């Protein structure tokens, strides 16, 4: 079965709401329309569906096939196009744990709906993504639960001797694939080991694996996140050779340089930069903050570009650099935590339901402080004229930078794309950070964005916040991403 190359996600990093949305914050029915739109008009071959939050719709398959019959008759869901469920991780997200079971129970129902629609056996959903994977046990529990309790219940006998299968019918598909999503430092360093343990003893010929790019940037800095992705991709290549199982890495990219720098106009650069990745995510900003023709062209390139081979990497040298850089990055974030949280209150939402929880609950903890989620965090810092990509940069020596450029050739491009939106006069941009990136880059600042951030800073200083959200959106519109 063909593995998708371009996964549309529901990450709310867009400035502009899509034309089909009833209001700026997308609700449940909007997300049904969105799934159809990305398949039929934009050309994505996969939609990730977050199975969490108050507006989650477990009847997404039925609604898609009912509302858009003509399209889905010609494009078989589960074969030509994928709908991939992102489930809660009960090990971390205790409050959402039982949603996992509800979601797994919905898979056979979707199978029945699709089989009736197509007049043949059809599995529209047969994979789930497990966030915050930290061990093979987390993956095996889901795989086993489906086999033993969802599929397995058909063998149970009721009081009158009738089996569940005879009474209700067969439960299909017979098994599901579990895609591990690695989101933190330890998870990425052990991603190949955990995946190998999960594969052990199973008759699996192909396995998808997923690397986060956004949350690691927030927790450890952009350079750390990129280097951790490189290590994991290299390790996956080695595991593939050792195990004989074909691996298909997915990488979660946003449009802000801090969160991946994937835009319709730089697909070739980013796919080459992340050689070894097979599937790339396109988040809301990619889809809705650019001309539709450019978006379609970008997605077509994503789907057609030849996957590269992950490069070798000097693991110990990389980890030494990450350690020093991350320490300085976190120190600088701590210095800004109060103003980040203050501005975050005015960053507009773009989805009605809460999305996945992530590493530290709905807010990010760093020591004894809480921070907003990655998109809001990024938007808040850009609004202050302090692109988060620049934080911690002063910790790197010229020797470090030479080494990093060999492993991460796009470093200069990503920093340049970010630094143009810095405000060199911002009181929140430290002198040591400013001098270090100006020496490295000689940036050309965006005058319009600088002027808007000055207005934001002035409004905060005099506590006149009535139009702060409007100014934050104005700056975001100039960048073509919210956060």
Curated annotation (Swiss-Prot):
It catalyses: oxaloacetate + phosphate = phosphoenolpyruvate + hydrogencarbonate. GO terms for biological process: carbon fixation; oxaloacetate metabolic process; tricarboxylic acid cycle. One of its GO terms (molecular function) is phosphoenolpyruvate carboxylase activity. Coiled coil: none annotated. Keywords: Carbon dioxide fixation, Lyase, Magnesium. Its cofactor is Mg(2+). It is an enzyme of class 4 (lyase). Inhibited by NaCl, KCl, ATP, ADP, GTP and aspartate. Unlike E.coli, not regulated by acetyl-CoA. Optimum pH is 6.8. InterPro entries: PEP_COase_arc-type (IPR007566), Pyrv/PenolPyrv_kinase-like_dom (IPR015813). SUPFAM superfamilies: Phosphoenolpyruvate/pyruvate domain (SSF51621). HAMAP family: PEPcase_type2. Catalyzes the irreversible beta-carboxylation of phosphoenolpyruvate (PEP) to form oxaloacetate (OAA), a four-carbon dicarboxylic acid source for the tricarboxylic acid cycle. Belongs to the PEPCase type 2 family. This is Phosphoenolpyruvate carboxylase.
